[in-house]
Amino acid sequence: MAKRNVTAKKKVVKKNIARGVVYISATFNNTNITITDEMGNVICWSTAGGLGFKGSKKSTPYAAQQAVESALSKAKEHGVKEVGIKVQGPGSGRETAIKSVGATEGVKVLWIKDITPLPHNGCRPPKRRRV
């Protein structure tokens, strides 16, 4: 009988980080939340689709709120107490995600920045939808 190769899983190392940056990427289809330290190293992340929301439900404000709460609960385990917020994209979960970061107990918001890239008349946009 052949021996099984068992691979050991990586253990999550608990970091002690006081300040972090919350990146909210709100697209028309999904909302991604990434929490990093001040140097840009990723601590944890969460998405609306990863929480079980499928199809058009991923782009709802409620799904964005749940994604923020999930990511911040993971970040609190690493000791994050103060965060800055960087928001990108035109999605519907954008405002709700910002509000739910501010409403989370034990996390203080230091600043909010909009980092949505705006073209100076770059690429031609796609044609209009006809329904």
UniProtKB/Swiss-Prot annotation:
Keyword set, alphabetical order: Ribonucleoprotein, Ribosomal protein, RNA-binding, rRNA-binding
GO BP, sorted A to Z: translation
| Superkingdom field | Bacteria
Any one GO molecular function term: rRNA binding
Amino-acid biosynthesis as UniProt keyword: no
- A Pfam family name for this chain? Ribosomal_S11
Q: Where is it found, in Gene Ontology cellular component terms? A: ribonucleoprotein complex; ribosome
What job does the chain carry out? Located on the platform of the 30S subunit, it bridges several disparate RNA helices of the 16S rRNA. Forms part of the Shine-Dalgarno cleft in the 70S ribosome.
Per the similarity annotation, which family is this? Belongs to the universal ribosomal protein uS11 family.
Please give the subunit comment from the record: Part of the 30S ribosomal subunit. Interacts with proteins S7 and S18. Binds to IF-3.
Q: Which protein is depicted?
A: Small ribosomal subunit protein uS11
Q: Which gene encodes it?
A: rpsK
